Design a protein with these regions (language model features):
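Bacterial Sec-dependent N-terminal signal peptides
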Residues: 1-25
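Boundary regions of SH3-family modules and the immediately adjacent low-complexity/disordered segments
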Residues: 20-36, 82-130, 207-219, 225-227
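Terminal domain-start segments
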Residues: 20-27, 34-38, 109-175
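Beta-loop motif signature
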Residues: 21-81, 91
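Short, solvent-exposed loop/turn segments at conserved positions within beta-propeller repeat blades
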Residues: 81-83, 137-144, 199-203, 271-276
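Short beta-strand elements that form the blades of beta-propeller/WD-repeat-like
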Residues: 118-142, 186-199, 244-256
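Surface-exposed loop/turn elements that mediate protein-protein interactions on large endomembrane-trafficking
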Residues: 147-168, 207-223, 280-291
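Short aromatic loop motif centered on NTY/YTY
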Residues: 178, 194-196, 203-204, 216-295
Length: 295
C-alpha cells in the first residue's frame, strides 16, 4: 500500500511540475537548459534585471559579445519581435566583479564560437513569416530571421542575416568555424546548422565567408535528409583545399538515393542512385562576391 501511495505521489508531482513549466517552442534552437551554459550576449545592447521581468529598472547593461553563464531557466515569459521566451538567471563578470541577474533569452546567443580574439555570435533576431496564396486561401510559412555578428574586443565588425524555416528542422542549432578552406582573402568559413536530428527531417547548413578585410559574405546553402532504409538526399561542398578542389571554386554536389527492391545479405534494402547533380560557384576574393558558373 505504501509503495502504491508513493508511486501515485511521484506521478502527481511530475504532472504538477509539467503543468507549471511553460513551453517556449520559439526558443528551441538555443538548446539552453537549467545546467550551467556559457553563452555570449547576442543583442547589441541587453539590460540585466534584478527580477525576471521588466517591472524594475535595469540593474546593469551588457553588450554584444559579452560573456555570460546561464545558471537557470525561469518560468516567466516575455514576447519580443514575435518570439516568446523565458527569462534566464545569469552570472557574469563586470570590471573584475562577479555579478548576477536576469536577462531575456532572446538577447542571448545560440552556440558560442570563436577563433582567437574574434567571436562569431549568432541568434534568432525575430519572426520572418512569409505569406503566399494557394487557390483562394492565404497560407503562412513560419520562418525565423537569424543574424550572425563578428565581434572583436567588444566592437561589432560585421553582420549578416539569413532566414530559416520554423519547423522541425529548427529543433536544434549548431555553429562551427573552419579555416578559409583555400579561398583567396578568406580567414574563416562559418557554418550555421539547423536540424531536427531525426529521420526524414532536413539538416540545413548556411555558409559564410569571413574575409581578411573584415567582410562577412553569405555563400550558398546545403541540405541533407536521411530516412533510414528509404531515402538519402545528400548535398556536399568541395572547397579548393580539399580533394578534387579547384582554385577559388566551391563545388556543390547532390546525390539522391532511394531503396530498391533488392535486399543485401543483412536483410536491408539496397539503395540506388536516382539523381545526381553538380554546380560550381566562383569566388571573387578581391570584391568578396560569389557567383554561379554558367558552364
Amino acid at each position: 500500500m505504501k509503495r502504491l501511495l508513493l508511486s501515485l505521489f511521484i506521478l502527481v508531482t511530475h504532472f504538477v511540475y509539467a503543468q507549471e513549466v511553460p513551453d517556449f517552442p520559439d526558443m528551441r534552437s538555443w538548446m539552453i537548459n537549467s545546467n550551467d551554459s556559457d553563452r555570449y550576449v547576442f543583442a547589441d545592447t541587453a539590460y540585466v534585471r534584478v527580477t525576471p521581468d521588466t517591472k524594475q529598472a535595469p540593474l546593469d547593461t551588457l553588450f554584444a559579445g559579452d560573456n555570460i553563464t546561464v545558471s537557470d531557466v525561469t518560468t516567466n515569459g516575455l514576447t519580443i519581435r514575435g518570439l516568446k521566451g523565458p527569462w534566464l538567471s545569469i552570472n557574469y563578470i563586470r570590471n573584475g566583479v562577479h555579478k548576477s541577474g536576469y536577462i531575456w533569452q532572446g538577447l542571448v546567443s545560440c552556440k558560442p564560437m570563436r577563433r582567437g580574439d574574434v567571436k562569431f555570435v549568432y541568434g534568432i533576431e525575430r519572426r520572418a513569416d512569409s505569406i503566399y496564396r494557394r487557390g483562394k486561401n492565404w497560407d503562412t510559412i513560419p520562418r525565423f530571421l537569424v543574424k550572425l555578428k563578428v565581434i572583436r574586443n567588444g566592437t561589432i565588425l560585421a553582420k549578416a542575416t539569413l532566414t530559416t524555416y520554423d519547423d522541425e528542422s529548427a529543433n536544434t542549432s549548431e555553429g562551427k568555424v573552419m579555416s578559409g578552406m583555400g579561398l583567396a582573402n578568406v580567414q574563416n568559413i562559418v557554418v550555421l546548422s539547423f536540424s531536427g536530428e531525426a529521420c526524414g527531417i532536413p539538416t540545413l547548413d548556411y555558409y559564410f565567408a569571413w574575409t581578411n578585410n573584415n567582410q562577412l559574405v553569405r555563400l550558398s546553402n546545403k541540405m541533407n535528409v536521411v530516412d533510414a532504409g528509404s531515402l538519402d538526399h545528400s548535398e556536399t561542398f568541395t572547397f579548393p583545399n580539399e580533394k578534387n578542389g579547384k582554385p577559388d571554386r566551391i563545388i556543390w554536389n547532390m546525390i539522391n538515393e532511394e531503396a530498391s527492391d533488392k535486399i543485401d545479405k543483412h536483410g536491408e534494402y539496397i539503395m540506388e542512385v536516382t539523381d545526381k547533380k553538380t554546380t560550381t560557384y566562383i569566388w571573387d576574393g578581391v570584391n568578396g562576391t560569389i557567383s554561379k558558373s554558367m558552364q
